[in-house]
Regions:
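Bacterial N-terminal signal peptides
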Residues: 10-20
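Bacterial Sec-dependent signal peptides at the C-terminal "C-region" and cleavage site
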Residues: 19-27
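Acidic/polar surface patches and capping/hinge elements
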Residues: 27-433
Length: 433
């Protein structure tokens, strides 16, 4: 994945140099920098949530920089009166400066020269003068506000998970060995971007082991999620693997596609708001989700099915050799595995619920035809007619992969939708004339 990402980054730099037209405010510049940010975020840390945090920081700053010029909506962090940007200030310069300045502060030093080159290419296409200077000043102020706000936010803080030997307790593969623990356990204690607390949207929690609901979930994933399942369809297998990909590139690609000419044709101001809302919602959904995961500490289907003899439920039949579809023998790149963190709630359910709710609220409708692209199947997008139908498939996909109980998926999606709705109601409100 990393070699592909580096190639995409170089392509993104070339794209900016080739496509920016002098003296013209173009929505493509913000899309180009979204691509660069996405590809750089993948290199910040090769796990989902270093990427999620990085994208939220970049796109939140870009929004504030553009909004300091247009003043159409409430700012996220930046006091627009302190900036004093004029309406004629270059939005392109503001976008590039905000994105560049945040990125160079959070990426590895070796990545800075490529970002500097891209930044210079963007500015070279903008005529020198008060417009460019005003845009740069807005971008600098927005980046500083974001970096100041996120200083000491708990990124990469030491985290020790609770691991239990009892039925229902989560433990890593190979227990009692504790190798391969969650590299992103710190996420659940990260300072939120928009919600009031990490536990604001606490889920109802997993079903009791002796309940009929748990039995139903157990038997469903045992059948549909097994590596050698005879009940899972070929399309369900494809969908399960398709969705096992980092959320940041999935949803930012869709945001750019929806913003494009011929779709919703969003200008720079609207794109800035959409990208900020999508990535801030995803970040806080991840924070809420990981806090909830370690609050409940519930075992995944693999452990539950193998050790069902000890769960106190006579209706759940153990299979000591049961393996999920998500295991290294499944032919795909990169290899699949049971994730090294608790089942409940589903991370993809949380993030996808938040993002898809954000798209729906931003566009004012659920019925929007679109394609989603995954690095697992680069040339085989999955098509949906509604945002809600994509979320429905994601809920199913985690069961078909054998890594989640349905309750974890459903409650995760619900949590994510609550985060997205909260953001839409409390942030980015129009400024009254």
């Amino acid at each position: 994945m990393i070699s592909t990402t580096r190639g995409a980054l170089c392509a993104g730099v070339a794209l900016i140099a080739a496509l920016v037209a002098p003296g013209v405010s173009r929505a493509d510049v913000i899309g180009d920098w979204n691509i660069l940010a996405q590809n750089e975020a993948l290199l910040i840390r090769p796990t989902a949530h270093g990427q999620t945090r990085g994208m939220a920081m970049v796109q939140g700053a870009v929004y504030d920089a553009v909004n300091a010029i247009t003043r159409k909506h409430e700012p996220y962090l930046l006091d627009v009166d302190d900036v004093g940007a004029q309406p004629f200030a270059s939005q392109d310069a503001a976008v590039a400066t905000a994105a560049h300045h945040v990125l160079v502060a959070i990426v590895a030093p070796a990545r800075v020269p490529a970002l500097d080159t891209a930044y210079a290419a963007t500015l070279a296409a903008i005529p020198d003068g008060a417009s460019e200077d005003g845009g740069v000043a807005a971008g600098e102020a927005a980046a500083k506000a974001m970096l100041d706000a996120r200083a000491g936010d708990g990124y990469m803080a030491t985290f020790t998970p609770t691991i239990g030997p009892d039925a229902g307790n989560w433990r890593p593969l190979g227990w009692p060995a504790t190798t391969g623990l969650d590299p992103d356990g710190w996420v659940g204690n990260l300072k939120p971007f928009v919600i009031q607390s990490t536990s604001q949207f606490r889920s109802k929690g997993p079903n009791a082991l002796t309940s009929a609901a748990y039995t139903k979930d157990f038997n469903e994933v045992k059948s549909l999620g097994a590596a050698n399942s005879t009940t899972r369809t070929a399309d369900q297998t494809t969908a399960a693997i398709f969705w096992q990909f980092a959320p940041a590139p999935l949803w930012n690609r869709l945001a750019r596609d929806l913003a494009a000419p011929g779709r919703f044709n969003l200008d720079t101001d609207k794109q800035a708001r959409l990208y900020a809302m999508v990535n801030l919602a995803a970040a806080d959904a991840a924070i809420s989700c990981w806090n909830d995961k370690y609050h409940w500490g519930f075992w995944r289907p693999r452990a539950a099915i193998r050790e069902a003899d000890g769960d106190g439920n006579p209706a759940t039949i153990a299979d000591p050799g049961w393996e999920s579809l998500f295991n290294p023998s499944t032919q795909t790149t990169p290899p699949l595995a049971t994730p090294p963190f608790p089942d409940h709630p589903s991370g993809h359910g949380c993030l996808s619920g938040a993002v898809l709710r954000t798209f729906r609220e931003f566009l004012g409708r659920d019925k929007v035809p679109f394609d989603v692209y995954s690095g697992r199947f680069p040339n085989q997008p999955r098509h949906f007619e509604r945002f809600s139908l994509a979320l429905k498939e994601i809920v199913g996909a985690r069961i078909w992969g054998g890594i989640h109980f349905r309750t974890a998926d459903v409650q995760g999606a619900t949590m994510g939708k609550k985060v997205g709705f909260w953001l839409q109601k409390h942030y980015f409100q129009p400024v009254r004339p």
